[in-house]
Structures are given as structure tokens and as C-alpha cells.
């Protein structure tokens, strides 16, 4: 066998360097007169992605956008601890996870006062275990309890964000936060102020909105926290940003890089040195917005994309949610898959061996700059409206508007969710009880796939009820204007030459419902008041009970349900020439 020749540096000196103009001319020739704009991608964020990028695009762009060379990101599973729960089971699960690939733990505490910090310290020594805590109230008291365990120090962070979480009595909460910063100022491995940027991602905000709104929330703290008790520099040093992730791979990479760049810009405006900006930590968590209950194993692919984006974007810690968390309490299997995903990216894919893999990419550097500029514009608009929390109404309205647009795009097929509105599995057998899920208060109705899911689950229940010849009836609340989304999804399945018209309008602000009997299913609509009164009658709830929240699924005997639907004036929503059964069967792939 011949000896392997020695390696030598590659040289492409025989090839002429081509400019951007030369490449554009070549594209014009190859397209033979076709419009070059057809090669561009216009994203929902308003970014125009070009068919190619050249090194000339980097000229004039800010350099050194990534200021965190640390490649050893932390793998931090999340454990939710409910009300009046001491957290013993979650702590035991966390201790086991730390022996099986986890680097740290993140606890989301509904009731921080009930959480047993003494037991926590016994099982997970606080001075050596990296732990994050999310609390909504009582932050100072909680940190005092942690320190009272006798620990020599704390590693990790506290997420207490009264601005983003809309906590009442903001002035009192800010005072609490100042106390937390004071208590932990001598603990360099503990971040006392983690901003909940995931809130905006989990409600469908665009990447640009997320950047702008996070900066607006951060500015509120930089403006309102400094006092005689804590300095501006101490507030900045305590900062960490939690961000939510979605599967838009390159844009998520650009989002994290843009946030670091703009954080440096923001601190520079406050007169703080570059070193203060370099200390920023980013904790990235996979988002609920993109998760589905239909064909749920596709969630594994989504969170893989999201986690890779976080790592390549420079996150300091990542939390990967189990693929089944939307419809059930995660089990050992789903939790293990989620925990192992970052380990594979580190140990097998080797993503920890390069400090900034995105650096120098013509596309990613350009995209980072575009996102930073557009995100800064959103930030300035919020500040012009009074900043947060004054402008929270504007922020929530913009998030709602974008979410509705995405629901519309999903319904008409412009935005694809694999397994939900495209490439569905008509024979899918659910690993959960659809009736129980629809009745659950924990079923997240804010996600992108929810309108499609609730219809699919209600339809499956209807056909099951009919096949088993059950004599009970059900009304399922589908959401606001879901009938219109159903119509658009149905139209997409029909030949283009078929022209359809609605028999009844769907007035603004009405709720969409599915009325299912053993014989037929009917799409209907009702005002919120009509549905509320209807639900009280069916559930036998007194009118004077103030805190009643109508459930998504209501069942009763057929006669009672028919009388109530008629009594409260529900109106039928029909597609001319097709029954509701035809529409639902076609959408579910039965016809």
C-alpha cells in the first residue's frame, strides 16, 4: 500500500475571486430573464433572505458580536413543583438526573414558601450544585431561606421577573429584588436577576419582537432598581436572560447573538464598561409554542433543532422539555430522551469544541445584524410608548396579533406543522385520553397547534361516540374564530374549481364550538356570554358563583344538551353543500 502523501495547505490561487456583482450577473444569465426576486424568501418577520451571501456583506458589520467564548454549556432539566408541594419528589428526580448527564437543575416553583430548602440542601449541596429557581412572589424570603441552610455559597440563578410576569404591586416587588441582589452580591456564581424572555416566545412572538421586548424589560430594571442599596453596575452584573426557542434554526441562532450585541449597546448607553456586557449569561429553554399533542414524537425533532440553535448561538445553559409534556406528566422515558439530547450534541456531535461556530458565516453575520437592527427598533417603539410596564397593553396586543396571524397561516397551509396540518397520521392512536385532556386546566391553549388539535381531538371523540352508539352529547369549545380557520383548512383540501360560500356569518368576538351528538356533529358559534350561561346550566353552577371558568369540554344527556344549545341561541356555521360531518371527516383524512 502506497504511503499517504504529506498534507499541504490548500490553495485556490488559480481561481479568480468573484465579487457580489459578478455572482449576481451569473444568476441573471442562469435565470434567462426570470425574476430574481423569486429566489428571495420573505419571512413573517419582514426579513428578506437573499439567495446567496458574499464576504462583501460583512464589510461595515460590527465585529465581536459573540463575547462569550465558553463552550461548556450546562444541561439543565426543568422540574415543575406545584402549589403546597414541598418538592421532595422533584428533588429526588433531580438528584438522579445529575448522575445521568444533567449538569444543573431548574425548578419552577408555584409556591416557593412551601419548597423544602433543607431537604434540597441535604440531597443537592447548594454550594456545589448549579440550580435555578423560578418564583413569582417572596423572592427575598426564599433566598434568605437558601442561605440559612448553612451553605458556603450558592451556584445558579433566581428567575423573579415581576415586570414580564405582570406581578401586582411592582414597587414592592422591585424592593424585594433589590434585597435579593444585596444578599447575593458576594456570590459570583449566582445570578439574582433572570429576565423571563421565554414569556414572549411562548406566546408566538416573532424573533424580532422577542429581542425588542426583552430589551424593554431589561431597561425597566436598569432604570428602576439602582438605589442607595444597589448600584447600576451591581444590577447589570446580576443579569441573566432566559429565552424561549422555536424551530426556526438560523433565526434562533441570530436571536441569541443579537441579544448579546444589543445588551452591550444598552450597557454602553448607561456608561458601563465592555466587561459588564461580557458577563451576561443566557439560559435557553425549548418553547411550548411549537410543541404538539398530535404525532408527538415529532417534538423530538423540534427540540433538537431548538437546542442546536441555542448552543450555536452561544447559550450558557439549555433546558430541553420532554416531548410529551403538553399532554401528560413526563415519564422516565421521555425525560431521559430530553436529558440525553444536549449530551449527544456535546459528546457525539462535538458542538462544544468550537467557541463560535457561526462566526464568519456571511448569512448568519448578516442575519444577526438585521435582527439586531429590527429588534432595536421594536425596543425604541416600546420605550416611546412609556416603556414597560406602562406599555404592557401594547406588547400583549402585538403578541396576540402575531399569534392570530400564525393561526391563520397554519389553517391555510402557509405555515406547516408536521403531523398536525400536514402529513397527519389518520390512524394515530392517542397515548392519552382526549376527553380528559380537553377538560384539563393544564392543557396549554396558547400554542400554535392548539386550534388544529382541539378540532382533531373533538372530531375523534365524535366519531368514537357515534361508533359506540353512546346516547350522550358533547359541546367542545374550539376557541375564538376557529370556525373560520376550519373553513380555510377545508377549502385547501378541495379542488380549486369548487366555489363555496358560508350560509351564516361569524360575528367578531364570538366563540366557535362543536356540538356532537350520536347522530351528527355541528359547527356552531356563540357569544362569550351565551357560552358562559350555557356552561353554568350544563355544569349546574349557580349564577352568583364568581370564579367559574367554563371548561373546554361539556357533556350531558342528549335531551339536556339539545335544549340548552337551543335556549342560549347557538347559531350553526355551515359550508354550503357540505355537512359538518363532511368537513370534519375530510379534515381528519377519513374521506
Feature names for model-found ranges:
Residues 2-248, 279, 311, 317, ...:
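Catalytic alpha/beta active-site cores
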Residues 37-39, 227-238, 269-279, 348-358, ...:
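Flexible, glycine/charged-enriched surface loops at secondary-structure junctions
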Residues 290, 322, 326-328, 349-357, ...:
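N-terminal glycine-/lysine-enriched basic segments
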Residues 240-426, 431-434, 563, 568-574, ...:
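Active-site capping/gating regions of soluble enzymes
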Residues 5-18, 34-41, 47-63, 316, ...:
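Intrinsic disorder at enzyme termini
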Residues 1-6, 348-352:
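Short, compositionally biased low-complexity segments
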Residues 30-34, 297-306, 469-472:
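Short, hydrophobic/aliphatic alpha-helical segments
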Residues 35, 180, 269-270, 302-306, ...:
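Glycine-rich, charged/polar anion/phosphate-binding loops
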